[in-house]
Amino acid sequence: MAESSNISVTGIGPVKPEQAAPLFLMRDPVIFPYSLTPLLVDEENLAALRQTMERDRLLAIFPELPGDEELGVLPLQVTLKLFNYREKRRSGVGILVRVVKELNFPDGSVRILVRGLKRIFCHAIETAGGVPSARYVICNESASENEDTENKARQKSAVAAFQELAGAMPGIPEELQVAVLNAESPGRLADLISDALNLNYAEKILLLSMTDVRRRF
């Protein structure tokens, strides 16, 4: 029988989670939708990886929160949704990822390449057979935001600022610059830029936790 530990996440209204994915425990990096990220799989996460590779290749990631000193760089009015699991504070807003590739090395280490899919809210953690899984709901962005004139102005300003930054920092990949220029969705644009910017860990967790697209610009 699965052992269930319900986690209350405030501010998201009534939820009826119908989806679950193996829980991948990690601190960093912060993964955003659309991004491709390599990860080292430690012993703690190996069972979760094996389980998902036999199914749909989906993993749920809720980043570990940094200490209070690092969180102190965030604006005072910010309140992060969080929960405690295995004596660690974790963000209540995480990311659903798909495993694109698994690589096994001669030294026994395992690395995976994952693609960020959607922001998700954690509703509960369940453990069955020693493998934790997260019950979650997908954070849906309001369609009206895509038609908002003010939001489109923010998009234009963000693209211009990113182009200026890319000109001063040659290390930004050309394919990322092309993706930013052609991003039709304000949410996708904000996430592409957030992933590319050299922000600290706490700031990236804050951006991941923002389900209102307008706040990300």
Report residues per predicted region.
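N-terminal low-complexity, acidic/polar interaction/targeting segments
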Residues: 2-217
